Amino acid sequence: MDALGRYYTNDIISTLLISNLKTSKPKRILDLGVGDASLTIAAYARWEKAKYFATEIEPKKANAIEKKLAFIKVLNCDTLQPNASTKLKVKFGSIDIAICNPPYARVENKERYHGLFKSVGCKDFNNLTRITSEIVFFAHNLKLLKYDGELGIIVSDSLITGKEFKIFRETIFEKFNVRRIIQLPDKVFNKTEARTHIIFISKSKSTNTTCELLNSTIQGELSEKIIVPNKLLIERMDFQFYKANIQIQKDAKTLKQIGGVIKRGKFSYKELRESDVPFFHSVHFKENGVKICFETAVSKRLQNFTANKGDILMCRVGKRVVGKVVLIKSGSVVYSDCIYKITVPKSFRQILLESFLSDEGKTWLKAFAHGVCSQVISKSDLENFPLFNLKIE
């Protein structure tokens, strides 16, 4: 990394980025923060008839690139300026492909970018606790791209996995078509082990609910792709995390395999509220911890609709509480039709509870909950829930 926070792209990674773009005959290509022009040179090898535009903060380097590469027009400017995209004298919405390896640096005075973010449909970026140079470059690229134009941008691992950047991930999946994410090897850039990724995104609203994740070797060879639901990628977007979780699931016993029985409650919340029977519903998860005790006995006529000591109750439907669980330590209770009662052999109770509460378990439940407003976990999916701490022998 140089004094300006730049990691220069090596030729293999440049070729990898260019080869994964889908546009066949672009007319205009943009490279903000062109650096040593590695990305542009790789692009020219594929599309020599296109017109090339770039920015470069260092005057000497900007002049040197234009002299060396006659096909590219380089503007000497600081791309971190909120109005940088206006200085290029390129019509907004006219670029077919944007390629970018932005610098990585924290940006002060984030309020000055409010107008830029709003202009590209990303006003929620203003709610981020901090802004990095990558996000500013991202927004400038979007402003200059035409509708359905492509952006291939190299970003840091923080943007891909950091909790403080969840709003960034949520926004790009909501507003645009994130088609593919490639995780790069840790030592791909000289003099650093910084982990980086390439995001391939189109400036159009996506109808896809999933995204492709791949991993690259130092030679630029790609792994088998894995398909991950977009709503899951809001939490994190790195290939290695999801690849590891898939392997864990393959090796683990399922709820059905350990003899688990799942039953849905019979009575609605309205019916139970109008009765004089103590009951358990989705609203009660907020009031209780992981384990719960019930003191009242349930009448014999309701015993077929009750959960008892050792059972696990799960919210099967809802927006914020779907997948929440509690273990009954004592007593019995009638449960509503929004709840699953899960009964397993005693030896598996604690392992199952820990699996539900683990990061892997929460990720799994989030992936398999479906629906637009109110989300639902189906019984058939839940039967295949993997016990992450229990391997197949």
Task: Tell where the protein language model's regions lie, with residue ranges.
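Short amphipathic alpha-helix with an adjacent loop that forms part of the alpha/beta core around
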Residues: 83-93
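Non-catalytic DNA-recognition/assembly elements of restriction-modification systems
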Residues: 99, 222-268, 384-393
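Sequence-specific dsDNA recognition surfaces
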Residues: 119, 255-266, 283-309
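A short beta-sheet element
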Residues: 303-305, 312-357
